[in-house]
Amino acid sequence: MELTTRTLPARKHIALVAHDHCKQMLMSWVERHQPLLEKHELYATGTTGNLIQRATGMNVNAMLSGPMGGDQQVGALISEGKIDVLIFFWDPLNAVPHDPDVKALLRLATVWNIPVATNASTADFIVQSPHFNDAVDILIPDYQRYLAERLK
């Protein structure tokens, strides 16, 4: 597939997602990095988003709860170029009923080449990167060219 460039803005749109056994870990991480995160637009699946809002007072665009379709809503936003970074603390030791949605979310983040953290260490690296508060170009699939080729 041909690639094109997308510019992630200086003010990022960040999705925050956590499985039940990882919510407290994500909450602690968000509270530690609140001064950095406040400068960006936050999105989250339902329960996680409401917990973050309650604990920090930060505005969070909350989707549905993950098992109720929230993971798919975040994935759709990624596909539309509306999410720039995914912080997803998932539980590798416990299966969840919506595992296919989880796999789809991670697949879309990979397809659209956005930064993804699945644990606190990687999330720390992302927010401490010199690029975190700057506009940065990434390569993404050239969907218009892909569509034109498919419709020949």
UniProtKB/Swiss-Prot annotation:
Location of the active site: D71
EC number(s) from the headed UniProt entry: 4.2.3.3
Span of domain MGS-like: 6-152
Keywords: Lyase
Binding site for substrate: H19, K23, T45, G46, T47, T48, S65, G66, H98
MF terms in GO: methylglyoxal synthase activity
PROSITE patterns, sorted: METHYLGLYOXAL_SYNTH, MGS
Catalysed reactions listed for this entry: dihydroxyacetone phosphate = methylglyoxal + phosphate
Matches recorded under CDD domains: MGS
InterPro entries: Methylgl_synth (IPR004363), Methylglyoxal_synth_AS (IPR018148), MGS-like_dom (IPR011607), MGS-like_dom_sf (IPR036914)
GO biological process, any: methylglyoxal biosynthetic process
Known role: Catalyzes the formation of methylglyoxal from dihydroxyacetone phosphate.
Similarity section: Belongs to the methylglyoxal synthase family.
The name this protein goes by in its record: Methylglyoxal synthase
Originating species: Citrobacter koseri (strain ATCC BAA-895 / CDC 4225-83 / SGSC4696)
Underlying gene: mgsA
